Amino acid sequence: MIREERLLKVIVAPHISEKSTIAAEENNTIVFKVAKDSTKAEVKAAVEKLFEVEVTGVRTLNVKGKTKRTGARFGRRNDWKKAYVTLKEGSELDFVGGAE
């Protein structure tokens, strides 16, 4: 069993993009930014506990930070981890709250 304190630190934020919106509409899949050291089991447990939905699958990937330039200096954004969480048929998460 994963401690509740850890579950609250696993999910960082929902990741909103054109690709994630299409995935949500067509495949009932929600995309989250998650902690870099989190596992698929932790992500599944966190989503089920926090949002009270049933998860059928979790796919994770590491996103490399982009190199950015400010004047003559180059810097690099941080690497981060993304999780595609597939929900059971009939389950739904709404982050926008019906705003249209």
UniProtKB/Swiss-Prot annotation:
Annotated signal sequence range: none
GO-annotated cellular components: ribonucleoprotein complex; ribosome
UniProt-listed SUPFAM superfamilies: Ribosomal proteins S24e, L23 and L15e
GO biological process: translation
Residue ranges of the TM segments: none
Keywords from the named record: Ribonucleoprotein, Ribosomal protein, RNA-binding, rRNA-binding
GO molecular function, one term: structural constituent of ribosome
Coiled-coil regions listed in the entry: none
Function summary: One of the early assembly proteins it binds 23S rRNA. One of the proteins that surrounds the polypeptide exit tunnel on the outside of the ribosome. Forms the main docking site for trigger factor binding to the ribosome.
Classification via NCBIfam families: PRK05738.1-1, PRK05738.1-3, PRK05738.2-4, PRK05738.3-2
Subunit structure: Part of the 50S ribosomal subunit. Contacts protein L29, and trigger factor when it is bound to the ribosome.
Family statement drawn from the similarity comment of this UniProt entry: Belongs to the universal ribosomal protein uL23 family.
HAMAP family (alphabetical): Ribosomal_uL23_B (MF_01369_B)
Name of the molecule in the record: Large ribosomal subunit protein uL23
Organism of this sequence: Pseudoalteromonas translucida (strain TAC 125)
